[in-house]
Amino acid sequence: MAAKDEKFGNEARIKMLRGVNVLADAVKVTLGPKGRNVVLDKSFGAPSITKDGVSVAREIELEDKFENMGAQMVKEVASKANDAAGDGTTTATLLAQSIVNEGLKAVAAGMNPMDLKRGIDKAVISAVEELKNLSVPCSDSKAITQVGTISANADEKVGALIAEAMEKVGNDGVITVEEGTGLQNELEVVKGMQFDRGYLSPYFINKPETGVVELENPYILMADKKISNVREMLPILESVAKSGKPLLIISEDLEGEALATLVVNSMRGIVKVAAVKAPGFGDRRKAMLQDISVLTGGSVISEELAMDLEKSTLEDLGQAKRVVINKDTTTIIGGVGEKQAIQSRISQIRQEIQEATSDYDKEKLNERLAKLSGGVAVLKVGAATEVEMKEKKARVEDALHATRAAVEEGVVAGGGVALVRVAGKISNLRGHNEDQNVGIRVALRAMEAPLRQIVSNSGEEPSVVTNNVKDGKGNYGYNAATDEYGDMIDFGILDPTKVTRSALQYAASVAGLMITTECMVTDLPKEDKTSDASSSPAGGMGGMGGMM
């Protein structure tokens, strides 16, 4: 086991504080409409430029191990806020820095660290309740645009694009961000249910100019099994041929004579047919087949349910207005399933999302939810260079997370005003002793930090502006972009309540633990063991040279 280095008391806390300040000072320059960029060096390729707090935080590692421990703990604040709400990382870092700085001053002055932490926790619990009271719902397109604009560093086009995407696919719809090929941002919306399985044979293509299969008002056969024997399909093929409608077959696999027969029938025009593999694997494939059956009003032919493909009828088949298949994807548009059944399935998936423990499972369940409830929107980010592309993509992703958070829990006045108002409302809060009261004051002072930093980054005097805002009421605040005072809601400066709440809670949680730290332990640096020159191969060669 490696030897350890230890530091105690004030010496440990000073080291930790230095690390906190190094990281927070690098992150906080990005805050607000006039926040600056940070350039991050990469081990290969061009440096990246960002205004995203968590991206800056992740890059910081300090040489001194004790200082680095302080920096890593604040990095945890930024990461947690990012995971919870997708934004607010800079605010969370700033709040943590303020609480740690003010808290450690109080500890140095002789206050009890545990009582300080209790006071901070008490203030944060009350502040969260007040934030909920200040919050207003964010449901209309205008408010969503404003939230997206603020989070995308005052880029109105990004805000409008996100609002348009949410309008088209619904609040539960999947919106993904990709790198585009042009200079302009683009929005691509896929209506209906799309899954990543293409046609099993190019001979099914009936639109050679575009290389796709298009089926109008088709029947849809869903089978949770491999189909290789053509005989078990003959009854259903004959029924479909008599109806004059096309047929889409979705199965675990289709091979051998079954596939060959379908291709021949399709090419001769006897029955218009196409086949694709079922999406997903294992249990997820069964669930997705069930989703398709609910959407199209059919049944999944499954041997587990003692259903026989040979005995299936037209009533077992689903239907849709249109199906489009290319070599990679299948899109089912206008499924004729009952609305009540679809809503019931959506509720079931929502319940599964709440119970899911892994991020991967949640992501896949959200994709299924979106495909059932509306569709998928793809935001394609345009830029002139790769460096700009990466920076812009990160901003768009932040804005998307912020708008989702706003729809979920509502919005409050932005620009640091909400926390200042909350601090004013709970200024009379008291603890069980004077040390707890100091902890409460530490938290209240920290709630002013975001406003002070926004003002500082815009080149104005923080104390003057903060006092002016504190003297105002309601949504009255300072617009750093235009250097004027007024109603922040009217200015369109909004923050999602969830983002502000998460930032405050995670900052107080980690900062409270740091204030109560009394000892820090880390590995001692390993010494380089250099071999003696006399034992090196070169020494031996020298001896040989002397013999000659």
Curated annotation (Swiss-Prot):
Name of the featured protein: Chaperonin GroEL
Source organism superkingdom: Bacteria
Cross-referenced HAMAP family: CH60 (MF_00600)
Gene3D superfamilies found in the cross-reference section: GroEL, GroEL-like equatorial domain, TCP-1-like chaperonin intermediate domain
InterPro entries xrefs: Chaperonin_Cpn60_CS, Cpn60/GroEL, Cpn60/GroEL/TCP-1, GroEL-like_apical_dom_sf, GROEL-like_equatorial_sf, TCP-1-like_intermed_sf
Database matches in NCBIfam families: GroEL, PRK00013.1, PRK12849.1, PRK12850.1, PRK12851.1
Family as reported in the entry's similarity comment: Belongs to the chaperonin (HSP60) family.
Biased composition (Gly residues): 539-548
Organism phylogeny: Bacteria, Pseudomonadati, Pseudomonadota, Gammaproteobacteria, Enterobacterales
MF annotations from Gene Ontology: ATP binding; ATP-dependent protein folding chaperone; isomerase activity; unfolded protein binding
Renumbered residue ranges of the record's region Disordered: 525-548
Residues reported in the UniProt entry to bind ATP: 30-33, 51, 87-91, 415, 479-481, 495
Subunit field text: Forms a cylinder of 14 subunits composed of two heptameric rings stacked back-to-back. Interacts with the co-chaperonin GroES.
Primary role: Together with its co-chaperonin GroES, plays an essential role in assisting protein folding. The GroEL-GroES system forms a nano-cage that allows encapsulation of the non-native substrate proteins and provides a physical environment optimized to promote and accelerate protein folding.
Places the protein is found: Cytoplasm
UniProt keyword annotation of Disulfide bond present: no
Record's keyword terms, sorted: ATP-binding, Chaperone, Cytoplasm, Isomerase, Nucleotide-binding
Keyword ATP-binding attributed: yes
EC number of the protein: 5.6.1.7
Pfam families (alphabetical): Cpn60_TCP1
First-listed, main subcellular location of the protein, grouped into a coarse class: cytoplasm
Gene Ontology CC terms: cytoplasm
A biological-process GO annotation: protein refolding
Reaction equation(s) it catalyzes: ATP + H2O + a folded polypeptide = ADP + phosphate + an unfolded polypeptide
